[in-house]
C-alpha cells in the first residue's frame, strides 16, 4: 500500500457530497453513475490483467470472466454500467440482478447490457454441478450490492445468500472486488456485524469512506471528476491519477 493520502468521508458527508455534486456543479445522477461505473470497470480490468497474482492469471487464452452482483440502488447501477464497459473492453460479463429497479434509468441500463449480449440472472449460478464447473468459474466477482447508504444491520435476503455465495467463489480462487463499501459493512465502522465478508480489492468512489481504514486488500480510488472546490470543502486530496486513467491504486 502506498503513502498517498486522499482523505476519508463519513456516511453523512458522503451523502451530502453526492447531493452537492448534483446541485452546485450540476451533475446528473446518470452522469455520476456512468463515471463511477467506468471507474469500477477500469479497476476490474487492472485486477484481471495486471494484477492480483495467481487468482486472475491468464487461463489458456480464454476471455476473462467477470460476475457482477448488483443491488437494487445506485451501487447496483454502478455495477450495470461497469458490466457494459467491461464487455466493450473484451471481457465476458455476467450480471446477477435479483431485484431490478423500475426507475427508467435503471431500465435503460439493463437494456444497454442486454444489447451487448450480457446475461442477466436472478441468482448466482450454483457451483455444485460438476458438469458446469467451467460455466461458473469467474476471474473476478464484483460486489455491487450496497453502497454508502447501508448502516450496520445484517443484510436481508436475497442478498445475504448472495454475499455467502460470493465468499465461496472467493475461496475457489475468484478475486472478490467490492464497489465503494464491502456489502454488509457499516460505512463508518466497517464489519460491525461479523459478516466474514473480506474482499480482495476495494474500489472507493469519489473518495474512500471511513470503513476503508479497516480494509486490508488492494485499494483503488475513482474520483477524477471531482471539482477542486468540492474536494477542498470535504477535505479530499485527489491522487495523481496516471495518464488518462479514471482510477489509481493507493
Swiss-Prot record:
Q: Which reactions appear under catalytic activity for this entry?
A: (6R)-NADHX = (6S)-NADHX; (6R)-NADPHX = (6S)-NADPHX
CC cofactor note: Binds 1 potassium ion per subunit.
InterPro entries per record = YjeF_N_dom, YjeF_N_dom_sf, YJEFN_prot_NAXE-like
The terms describing its cellular component in GO are:
mitochondrion
Q: What is its EC number?
A: 5.1.99.6
Q: Please explain the role this protein plays, according to its UniProt record.
A: Catalyzes the epimerization of the S- and R-forms of NAD(P)HX, a damaged form of NAD(P)H that is a result of enzymatic or heat-dependent hydration. This is a prerequisite for the S-specific NAD(P)H-hydrate dehydratase to allow the repair of both epimers of NAD(P)HX.
Which cofactors, by name?
K(+)
Keyword NADP on this protein? yes
Q: Does the keyword DNA repair apply?
A: no
The chain positions of domain YjeF N-terminal read 14-238
- What keywords are assigned to this protein? Isomerase, Metal-binding, NAD, NADP, Nucleotide-binding, Potassium
User: Which parts of the sequence bind (6S)-NADPHX?
Assistant: 74-78, 147-154, 159, 180
The protein's name = NAD(P)H-hydrate epimerase
Q: What molecular functions are annotated in GO for this chain? A: metal ion binding; NAD(P)HX epimerase activity; nucleotide binding
List, alphabetically, the Pfam families matched: YjeF_N
Residues that, per the record, bind K(+) = 75, 143, 183
**PANTHER family (alphabetical):** NAD(P)H-HYDRATE EPIMERASE (PTHR13232:SF10)
**Per the similarity annotation, which family is this?**
Belongs to the NnrE/AIBP family.
Amino acid at each position: 500500500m502506498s503513502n498517498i493520502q486522499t482523505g476519508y468521508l463519513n456516511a453523512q458527508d458522503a451523502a451530502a457530497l453526492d447531493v452537492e455534486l448534483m446541485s452546485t456543479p450540476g451533475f446528473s445522477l446518470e452522469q455520476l453513475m456512468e463515471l463511477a461505473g467506468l471507474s469500477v470497470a477500469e479497476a476490474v480490468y487492472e485486477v484481471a490483467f495486471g494484477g492480483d497474482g495467481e487468482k486472475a492469471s491468464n487461463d489458456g487464452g480464454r476471455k476473462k470472466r467477470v460476475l457482477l452482483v448488483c443491488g437494487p440502488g445506485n451501487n447496483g447501477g454502478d455495477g450495470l454500467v461497469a458490466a457494459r464497459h467491461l464487455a466493450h473492453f473484451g471481457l465476458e460479463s455476467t450480471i446477477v440482478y435479483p431485484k431490478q429497479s423500475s426507475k427508467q434509468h435503471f431500465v435503460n441500463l439493463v437494456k444497454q447490457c442486454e444489447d451487448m449480449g450480457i446475461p442477466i440472472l436472478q441468482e448466482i449460478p450454483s457451483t455444485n454441478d460438476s458438469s458446469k464447473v467451467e460455466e461458473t468459474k469467474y476471474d473476478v466477482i464484483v460486489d455491487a450490492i450496497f453502497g454508502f447508504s447501508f448502516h450496520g444491520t445484517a443484510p436481508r435476503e436475497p442478498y445475504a445468500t448472495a454475499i455467502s455465495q460470493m465468499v465461496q467463489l472467493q475461496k475457489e480462487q475468484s478475486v472478490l472486488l467490492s464497489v465503494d463499501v464491502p456489502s454488509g459493512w457499516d460505512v463508518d465502522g466497517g464489519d460491525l456485524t461479523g459478516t466474514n465478508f473480506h474482499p480482495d480489492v476495494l474500489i472507493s468512489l469519489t473518495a474512500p469512506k471511513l470503513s476503508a481504514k479497516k480494509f486490508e486488500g488492494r485499494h483503488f480510488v475513482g474520483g477524477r471528476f471531482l471539482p477542486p472546490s468540492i474536494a477542498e470543502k470535504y477535505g479530499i486530496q485527489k491522487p495523481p491519477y496516471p495518464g488518462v486513467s479514471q482510477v489509481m491504486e493507493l
